[in-house]
Amino acid sequence: MPGRLNAYRDVAPPGRVDLLQQLSKQVRGQRMLHVNASRAVGGVAEILQHLIPLLSELGIQARWEVMEGTESFYEATELFHLGLQGLDVMVSEALVDGYLECCRTNARSLDLSADVVMTHDVPPLALVDEAATDARWLWQCHLDLSHPQRKIWSLLRPYVTKYDAAVFSLPQFAQPLALPQFLIYPSLDPLSDKNRELAPEELDQILEKLQIPRDKPILLEVSGFNKFTDPLGVLAAYRRVKTHNDCRLVLAGSMPTDGPASQRVLEEVRDAAAKDEDIHLVLL
């Protein structure tokens, strides 16, 4: 069976690709729809960019729909994400109403016809209210839901319970729910550019383009700009290291697109790094 799947034979456990091909015969021809809030930014988008072609190669009719959001929608979902991961946030009734209205609007504009619909994280969560009775709806939560803020979880839990099943990244990230729960452990595509070896000349070209000198050791942090990746904590760790070993810090991450809270974190990082020429902020 030619195709991209065969490229994984060198990195997957022996027999795993053959097993996937055998198992796929049971669901071949099934229509599977994934729904999230971005086609280009974030971990979910990265997963789906690689997953959709593999599902299609296995004979599953895989599609990917992306929600269209308003400013209030993205502000609400950002606060929901922060609250679900334990931060104390306040979400106004107007933001909640804006989120739900945006979900209703997307339910009318998106093609939700499928045998299985998998929504990712909070943005498409409330789409389940428009679920077709002949489809199975799964909610995949990529967040740590172990200690959610009670008010936020109480608000969103009724939508989660309408799903046929939920998917979490680790057992300790899940919540007690009266529906089947499954685990899909976090992973990176071993064949993606993130795992590709860079030749020394490529490294030199990249550092030269970014105007980062190679006169001292480099510490590298690649992550988003939010409270949970804690870039200010990374700066503090770098400064502790620097008292013993002179070095540079490269703090690389994508431009925040999920709401004002992440924008504020980025501004705090800029302010904290402004007077240190050995800190290099790279926005991808």
Summary of predicted features, one role per range:
Residues 1-31, 49-113, 175, 184-190:
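A conserved catalytic-core segment of Leloir-type glycosyltransferases
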Residues 38, 213, 222-226, 241, ...:
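Short donor-sugar binding/catalytic loops of nucleotide-sugar-dependent glycosyltransferases
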Residues 33-39, 106-123, 138:
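Short N-terminal targeting/anchoring amphipathic segment
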Residues 146, 157-215:
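Donor nucleotide-sugar binding/catalytic pocket of nucleotide-sugar-dependent glycosyltransferases
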Residues 230-246, 272:
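Short hydrophobic signal-anchor/transmembrane segments that target glycosyltransferases
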Residues 116-118, 129-147, 164-167, 181-186:
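Active-site proximal beta-strand in glycosyltransferases
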Residues 251-284:
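Nucleotide-activated donor-binding/catalytic signature segment of Leloir-type glycosyltransferases, i.e.
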Residues 33, 207-229, 235, 249-250:
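Conserved donor-binding/catalytic core segment of Leloir-type glycosyltransferases
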